[in-house]
Amino acid sequence: MFARTSTVLTIGVATLGLLATTAGAAPTYAVTATVPVGQTPMQVAVAPGGAVTYATNSGANSVSVIDTATNAVTATVPVGGGPTGIAVTPNGARAFVVNTADRSVSVIDTATNTVAATIAVGEFALAVAVSADGAHAYVTNGVESTVSVIDTATNTVTATVPVGAFPIQLAANGTHVYVTNSSDNTVTVIDTATTTVVDTIPVASHPSAVTATNDRAYVRSGAEMSVIDAATNTVTATFGVDGTMGGAAVTADGHTLYVVDSEGGAVTVFDPGTNTEVTSLAVGGSAGGVAVSADGARAYATSQNENTIATISRAPGDATLPR
């Protein structure tokens, strides 16, 4: 579920023209490793420096810790029942893991790979995101139609925010959290500075996955993706995607969008500048979650059928145009 964000670069017309004349080959994408993990991996998160990834194993009640340099599991951390969502703090010191079956969040100390705290949340908790400053973690409670706000310094729930009907996923950028409400076809926007709902955005039926930069949020509703302008909180475009289920992750620079095709066991790569498909890569049956490294060089996707994490590497072209 869930990646770091940054402001998208803007440049002058003259500079853009120069880059356009010198641009060469487009980036290429390939699956460069497949790592066995625990039973039924659901979601994956990348540490800020990119050296480690974490995968939740729902069928094994554990989190696999993967060294991205060697593509090997270096630790397995026992957590609560049915772990699903996971997010890492910006300093990399903690990983927050949602245990859906236990209605709890396990807080992993990443220095020791041990659980430092367990926090009670709501029923059918599923997803978690951490604010850009690392001060708070946000957890969806589907049955209660709320989001729990956790103070990461004290590991306590300090607020519960009512949102739309049956929230299942969420994503944070520098200032807001975007929550997909699957039963009333909306996205709730929470201001992270005030912990209040500032907008509710209608989208297509049964929104699920969401990912965001400081400029845009991308919301999946089955085989359709909605693009939300973060400045106006309006849907500015929609486009089709492969399959109807699976996660989504956009790189911090906004240049690449990865969308999981769960039914097809693949990850589709999109160019957000044109909202068009670039390529599709096989990653394993019942692909689920996807996350990207902070530098955008790699993405990681789960295969629930094969109990693996696929590494997707992006090789840059001769030049990459900012958008």
Predicted regions and their residues:
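Predominantly soluble domains enriched in secretory-pathway, periplasmic, or organellar proteins
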Residues: 4-323
